[in-house]
C-alpha cells in the first residue's frame, strides 16, 4: 500500500509530459535535455527516467532503476519516522516528608520506567508552608537520582518551579520509548505514582 502511494508521487518515463528536463544521475552529464533525448539516455542505460522535482524549472529527472529508487525512498521514510519517535515522560510525585516505604515504592516504579526507555520526571510538591522544607526536597531528589544511577542519568538537576521542585532523568540505554536528540519536544505521559493506602476501620483515609 505504501509503495503504491510512492508510485503515485512520481511520474516516470512516458508519463513525464514536458518539453525539457534537467537530467541528473550516475554517469550522466548533468544538464537540460529535451524530454525525448532524456528518455533515450535512460533507455540506453537500461534505467528509468524518474521525475524527482516536478516544480523546478525545468523539472528535475533522475536516471535510475525505478524499483531501486522506490526502495531508497521507503528507507528514507523509515529513517525519518524513527527520528520522530515520541519521547515518553513518566511523572513521579513525592511529598517533602516522604517515608522509606513510599520512597522505595516509587523508586521501584522509576527503575521500571527507565528500563523500558521512558524518561522520569520526579518532583516534590510543597503544600502550604511545607515550601519551607525545599532544601529537604532537593536532598530527596538527589538521593533518588543517586539510587537510579545504574538505570538513568540526570538530564536536569533539581529546580524549583512554583510549588514543585523537579528533577529529570533519562534512561542510560535507549528503549522503545526513547528518541534521538533530533526528535521533537517530548510527549509527557502523566502517570503520577503514589503509594497505595491500606484500608483502615471506618474507611479513614490518610494523606501523604
UniProtKB/Swiss-Prot annotation:
Domain of life: Bacteria
The entry's keywords: Cytoplasm, Initiation factor, Protein biosynthesis
GO CC list: cytosol; membrane
Signal peptide: none
Swiss-Prot/TrEMBL GO biological process terms: ribosome disassembly
Subcellular location field: Cytoplasm
Major location (coarse): cytoplasm
An annotated Gene Ontology molecular function: ribosome binding
Subunit field text: Monomer.
Cited function: IF-3 binds to the 30S ribosomal subunit and shifts the equilibrium between 70S ribosomes and their 50S and 30S subunits in favor of the free subunits, thus enhancing the availability of 30S subunits on which protein synthesis initiation begins.
NCBIfam families: infC (TIGR00168)
Family, as annotated: Belongs to the IF-3 family.
Protein name: Translation initiation factor IF-3
Gene source species: Parabacteroides distasonis (strain ATCC 8503 / DSM 20701 / CIP 104284 / JCM 5825 / NCTC 11152)
Amino acid at each position: 500500500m505504501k509503495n503504491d502511494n510512492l508510485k503515485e508521487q512520481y511520474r516516470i518515463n512516458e508519463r513525464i509530459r514536458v518539453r525539457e528536463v534537467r537530467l541528473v544521475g550516475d554517469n550522466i552529464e548533468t544538464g537540460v535535455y529535451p524530454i525525448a533525448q532524456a528518455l533515450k539516455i535512460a533507455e540506453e542505460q537500461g534505467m528509468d527516467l524518474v521525475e524527482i522535482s516536478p516544480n523546478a524549472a525545468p523539472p528535475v529527472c533522475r536516471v535510475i532503476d525505478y524499483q531501486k529508487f522506490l526502495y531508497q525512498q521507503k528507507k528514507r521514510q523509515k529513517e525519518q519516522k524513527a527520528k520522530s519517535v515520541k519521547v515518553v515522560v513518566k511523572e513521579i510525585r513525592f511529598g517533602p516528608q516522604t517515608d522509606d516505604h513510599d520512597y522505595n515504592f516509587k523508586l521501584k516504579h522509576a527503575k521500571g520506567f527507565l528500563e523500558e526507555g521512558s524518561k522520569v520526571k520526579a518532583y516534590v510538591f510543597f503544600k502550604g508552608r511545607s515550601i519551607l522544607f525545599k532544601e529537604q526536597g532537593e536532598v530527596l531528589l538527589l538521593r533518588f537520582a543517586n539510587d537510579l544511577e545504574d538505570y538513568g542519568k540526570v538530564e536536569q538537576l533539581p529546580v524549583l518551579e512554583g510549588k514543585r521542585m523537579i528533577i529529570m532523568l533519562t534512561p542510560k540505554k535507549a528503549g522503545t520509548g526513547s528518541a534521538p536528540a533530533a526528535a521533537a519536544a517530548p510527549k509527557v505521559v502523566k502517570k503520577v505514582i503514589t503509594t497505595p493506602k491500606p484500608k483502615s476501620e471506618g474507611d479513614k483515609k490518610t494523606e501523604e
